[in-house]
């Protein structure tokens, strides 16, 4: 059973958004990773038809759109993303780091089940509004 030291894990650029860095560990039924997002970065609104996901914010703030809800998530906030739920996050006010777990493990790529969702452009407008309100 492996132990991992995050500081020693290889950083790779994310497939869906190359501005992000991911450090990934893959098990039999789950995949997990530490994701670092630069300020205002993140993939467009998307969903995962085959994966359930949990995300825990570790550092910074994320503007998160989850289904019909949106909020600013901070360290200690845990987000559950069911399959088929449109979502996206952007670091806001500086870079952000989060831990995420997805099931099933698939091929181990955190972006494996990425499917851009309808309404992605509208979600970006919501981010611009959130930036104005926050800062």
What do these predicted regions represent?
Residues 10-45:
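A short glycine-rich, His/Asp/Glu-containing loop-to-beta-strand
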């Amino acid at each position: 059973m492996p132990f991992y030291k995050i500081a020693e894990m290889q950083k790779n650029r994310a497939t869906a958004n190359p501005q992000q860095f991911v450090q990934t560990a893959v098990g039999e039924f789950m995949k997990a990773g530490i994701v670092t997002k630069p300020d205002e970065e993140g993939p467009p609104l998307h969903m995962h038809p085959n994966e359930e996901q949990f995300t825990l914010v570790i550092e910074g703030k994320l503007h998160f759109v989850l289904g019909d809800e949106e909020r600013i998530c901070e360290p200690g906030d845990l987000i559950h993303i069911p399959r088929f739920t449109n979502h996206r996050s952007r670091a806001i006010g500086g870079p952000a780091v989060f831990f995420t777990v997805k099931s099933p493990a698939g091929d181990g790529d955190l972006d494996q089940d990425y499917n851009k969702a309808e309404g992605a452009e509208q979600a970006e407008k919501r981010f611009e509004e959130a930036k104005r309100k926050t800062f």
